[in-house]
């Protein structure tokens, strides 16, 4: 079962596409560009439509999704953590 999708190999986050992702659960992702699967252990409950980090991030790092810069990290994020407004901010303003 696919739990999250990743558009490009270089993306640092995947988008959760099922409900009920729980902390401690091994989740399976599909990298669309390469048609391959990856696995990550969720460190938090992650709602459908939200992002899961695919690598560790430090404040100031840039996050890529769909091959596009979606923002700057403002709080440390570990691989498998919920990546959202609490730890990523847009660079637009």
Label for each model-derived stretch:
Residues 2-93:
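N-terminal small-residue-enriched
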């Amino acid at each position: 079962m696919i739990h999250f999708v990743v558009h490009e190999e270089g993306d640092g986050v995947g988008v959760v596409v099922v409900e009920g992702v729980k902390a401690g659960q091994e989740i399976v992702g599909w990298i669309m560009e390469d048609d391959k699967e990856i696995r990550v252990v969720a460190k938090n409950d992650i709602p459908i439509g939200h992002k899961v980090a695919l690598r560790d991030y430090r404040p100031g790092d840039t996050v890529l999704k769909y091959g596009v810069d979606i923002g700057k990290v403002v709080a440390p994020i570990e691989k498998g953590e919920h990546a959202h407004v609490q730890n990523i901010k847009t660079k637009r303003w």
